[in-house]
């Protein structure tokens, strides 16, 4: 599942980026995509990539897979979330029902060192990998 703070920003950003990547890899014939709901499906296994906004918590909690569970969460522009409480709510809403999950975040670090996302990354966590790129 890929989330952003505002659902209306998904289609022209991460959804388009994922479709671009599928095309670049020459895998168009292996995936189906829909815009309502915003999803990409791997034809062979029927696994889905869900795209959801955090501006409607009910829709996040309403994600129910036809089989398995959501095991990967990517929070795009994580710094736009209201804080750690909202992030925790997103995690608990999406990553449930399975015994193993992966949680990815991407964002441009805010200039203010006191921003919640900058503070949170400074807290030691042996299960976390932080990668900086430009």
Where are these regions (language model features)?
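Phosphate/NTP-binding elements of NTP-utilizing enzymes
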Residues: 1-134
